[in-house]
């Protein structure tokens, strides 16, 4: 009997346990967090026993593989259209063209190759509250105070999140291809979504015009998105695509003083220089924070993208100028960043007043650790290495003032100069050449390390002001005006002189005459050799010598009646003599005349020699010398 009762009791307890278990499962909430403790049949408040518990799973894995596809293309207007912000959604039927580096060649895009990247744990020190409104408050205070806002350690956190695995070659290549893709929609098939601003933009405002472009990639689960910002247009001179606007932003962000104080070829984009190597830093910072500049446009673009994907993990990438803007966004909002051949951006990061963790100088953002930023590049690229600023560099001849030299975060450098013997040239800066000649050729990804002991604009002196000053640059021009001074009094001037009947002319002439007579008995080549020279102002008497002896010179006169080839063939010739008349020379203290007398030796020996030779010539040729003055 007792055994029968025990069996019935065991069956009842078993039935009660099964029904209790089923009831507990039915009463579970529909959504349960994986990190919360979930109990089957929770114990009563006074019970000392705990009910059965479901084993807890660990945190989500930070190591994963992502396959990305292009989802959107954003266009943010700057200079010409500052209110423009539009989005193009990529759909299966959307027809896109890929634009070449020079913007001239276009080809239809086919997305055959998947964009695959891996993620790994990444630690970033960033602000705990990263809402755009809070960040804007910090940036506004920095502009007003002239320096970054000082925050306490409680405002900062060390977050470990899923970031791009930059140790894998495939991941690096995928990000590089994202930066290389520059897409436009086939003309005539555009389907724009205007986010805000005016809706009556002209059709001439297109992809190759003013503005900042961003390509938005997302993985299959929309858990991770990548924002790729377009880099600098490769054309050197204004008028090709976004080249003019890119040059303005390049010279504003990466020059010591907006292109001032250097080469006359640099395009000057602000007026903040006070004197040689002295500039107003407040003026420069205000110009960089203008709403029509790339940094403000990049913040606006990022804010609208995160509104579409509020729970997604955001990664940034870009090439050249786009890489620098991506890095600035990463420092602002604490995002993982991978750039390629980026312009050194530590200089603008310091001037924008980005917040820095305690213990770090906000004026030296290159000293920060745990930024989550990786800059890939090679040693033959002068833009990446910060050396494209010499007098003979192509950057200077193109008007670019690329003076910054320091990167934030870590640099991952391919030493192509040492490994491949490349020479430093701007042609190696193009992203497609980097992909084909560097990233795909090297077997391994280079190690990444932070720059040490790097400083920008060491020759310059900067000062801050309250922002109310008006900064001007003085230019001195020299104008030459011809001046004519008339010394005559003329009421009716004419083409060939004054037409007045009488003209008054005032002229003063001073004349000084000195007459010196020297008597030298022993002349030399360089003066008189007499020990005493007598100077007398009285004219010397004239001495005349007459020679009565006639001089006879034979003169031959030939008459030929029968000339031949080699002379006259006549048998005889006649010779006549001519007697010259007497010749006299007169010598006076004023001058020597050769008119019928020869001096007696009072003249210089060279003078007597000359007169003797002159007499022989006269007698020989029968010349009639009237007057010679020596």
From Swiss-Prot:
What CDD domains does the annotation carry?
Lipase_3
Compartments (UniProt record): Endosome, Multivesicular body membrane; Prevacuolar compartment membrane
What reaction is this protein's catalytic activity? a triacylglycerol + H2O = a diacylglycerol + a fatty acid + H(+)
- Got a GO cellular component term for this one? multivesicular body membrane
- A single GO molecular function, which one? triacylglycerol lipase activity
Q: Is Hydrolase among this UniProt entry's keywords? A: yes
The keyword Transmembrane helix is assigned to this record: yes
- Kindly indicate where the leader peptide sits in this chain: none
Alphabetical list of Pfam families matching this protein: Lipase_3
Give the record's glycosylation annotations as residue positions. 200, 222, 280, 304, 466
Q: Which residues lie on this side of the membrane: Cytoplasmic?
A: 1-20
Q: What is annotated as the active site?
A: 320
What biological-process terms (Gene Ontology) are attached? multivesicular body membrane disassembly; neutral lipid catabolic process; phosphatidylserine catabolic process; piecemeal microautophagy of the nucleus
Composition skew (Polar residues), residue ranges: 577-589
What's in the keyword line of the UniProt record? Answer: Autophagy, Endosome, Glycoprotein, Hydrolase, Lipid degradation, Lipid metabolism, Membrane, Signal-anchor, Transmembrane, Transmembrane helix
Looking at the record, which segments are called Disordered? 577-599
Report the EC number(s), separated by commas if there are several.
3.1.1.3
The protein's topology relative to the membrane is: Single-pass type II membrane protein
Q: Name the residues that span the membrane.
A: 21-40
Q: Which PANTHER family match?
A: LIPASE ATG15-RELATED
Q: Which family does it belong to?
A: Belongs to the AB hydrolase superfamily. Lipase family.
Q: How does it assemble?
A: Binds to both phosphatidylinositol (PI) and phosphatidylinositol 3,5-bisphosphate (PIP2).
Q: What does this protein do?
A: Lipase which is essential for lysis of subvacuolar cytoplasm to vacuole targeted bodies and intravacuolar autophagic bodies. Involved in the lysis of intravacuolar multivesicular body (MVB) vesicles. The intravacuolar membrane disintegration by atg15 is critical to life span extension.
- Under which name does UniProt file this protein? Putative lipase atg15
Gene from which the chain derives? atg15
